[in-house]
Amino acid sequence: MGIDVKELIRRNRQKHAEFEKKINYKFIDLRLLQKALIHSSYAFEQAQAGKNNERLEFVGDAVLDLVVGNALYRRFPEMREGELTRLRAALVNEGHLATMARKINLGYFLCLGKGEDNSKGREKSSILSCAYEAVIGAIFQDGGYDAVAALVERFFLPVIDRRKEDLLLADAKSRLQEILQEKHNEGPSYRLDNEEGPSHKKRFTISVLFRDEVLGTGEAGSKKEAEQRGAALAIKKIESM
């Protein structure tokens, strides 16, 4: 038993070529790509638990933070540090990376253990996001910073341009919680101020409070979005102080 990377490369040559076409990057060293696609469950079944994609995932996580951060810095010179941080967090979190992985059908190319495969592991966000980071790590080891930057330019920046405000909003509540916990060891509260309109077209107004002070008020068609909008305004107020 054991993982023969050369044999896996030979066996998966057609898959690798298909994957390279999807990401528009051709590997110099296919061993790096193959290692990025080996999930820990497969390595464990082959009695070589250490020969999985986790080390490349570690590299990819750090590289993605750097490359996405630099791309945002260059693209949005008007943005403050806090906004850049929140936007980067929204782009490199598990949910968004899993979405990016699904767009290139990454799950299909993974080597999974039988148990994980049978439990729909190819569809799990945790597995897909980690594998995506591992692929980024492999590209960095193979082609360096510029190769990863080209991938970010191709796949991430179009999303940013279309959904910048949505991405910032989606992360606002968790970011506000982190800011207040770090500064005051205490989180915010949310107060429903108004609810109006028919059941199919409700409008909610929600205020964000901290120690009885209103930091921001959001209005939207759902409570969740109103809270996020209020939290985003609260963050702007805190950052301007």
Swiss-Prot record:
Hydrolase is among the record's keywords: yes
InterPro entries: dsRBD_dom (IPR014720), RNase_III (IPR011907), RNase_III_dom (IPR000999), RNase_III_sf (IPR036389)
Gene, per the UniProt record: rnc
Organism placement in taxonomy: Bacteria, Pseudomonadati, Thermodesulfobacteriota, Desulfobulbia, Desulfobulbales
Listed NCBIfam families: RNaseIII
Alphabetical list of SUPFAM superfamilies matching this protein: dsRNA-binding domain-like, RNase III domain-like
Cofactor: Mg(2+)
EC number(s) given by UniProt: 3.1.26.3
Cleaved signal peptide residues: none
Name under which the protein is recorded: Ribonuclease 3
Broad class of the protein's primary localization: cytoplasm
Catalyses which reaction(s): Endonucleolytic cleavage to 5'-phosphomonoester
Subunit structure: Homodimer.
Family: Belongs to the ribonuclease III family.
